[in-house]
């Protein structure tokens, strides 16, 4: 029997299809982030100015709903993915959570919603975009030279990618394979002294899964 080379499955490129359905005023998103999540206008405006926060209408079958979009953007400015947060509670559509929480199809699994303060020299990782925004709200007066990154879950690959990119001016993920990016953090730990105690902070929930992840 001849050995066959099995090619890795290539993921379809991400396409941001919500652009025509965005709401420039961000009114419903702003109300949700203020009333339900306790964020201030100042913080919301800061993230809106960053260009990666938006409000849009999502259609699923005959159901239309307003959503907040958290865009993952590469250093080249291209959108690599996005996560969606429902604004209006609907226990019929979402019996478990009450609101939509979803990563858009074909999003880059090693990317996440991020925000830079100054010129990043360290990284702070979060489970969700709104956790990231809440952290910024609490710490914004003292934050400097840091990149905040949402993993949309607990993903070592995201930590690996953003750490390697921080140490290479963003070049690592552009020049290396998916597998190499996944292994970058372990490789850096084994072969260099670049991973210092103050380089990476993991700011996640104090639950069993998160503690196991850390």
Predicted regions located by residue number:
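Conserved Rossmann-like nucleotide-cofactor binding loop
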Residues: 131
